[in-house]
Amino acid sequence: MSSAGLPAKPVFLITIDTEGDNLWAHPRTITTENAKYLGRFQRLCERYGFKPTYLTDYEMAVSAEYCAFAHDVLKRHAGEVGMHLHAWNSPPILPLTDDDYAYCTYLIEYPEAVMREKVRVLTALLED
């Protein structure tokens, strides 16, 4: 640390949005096939000494393949997991439009109690 309390070297932060396949094409059924490719990226990061942060949405948090990957990364202290909440498809589901999957409603658009519950549900999944 420098005398100003700053790191002596520059800090490099890598974040990866880990979310369902083709999510922005507005699918009704969301798959997580892309989870199987995260190990390859993780190995690349480890080769260069990087510890990425995987920002995780609901679909990934309930994907067995992603969960096995994330548990391994965390167990080895090789990266971190954070929350990436897509409000329109994270429980509890409360429709705000005639097609929330097309409009991709934001968390701030929901009643406060629903926002709080969406955060609680995803936090609980990620902590497990």
Annotated model-derived regions:
Residues 1-128:
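Catalytic alpha-helical scaffold of carbohydrate-active enzymes acting on polysaccharides/glycoconjugates
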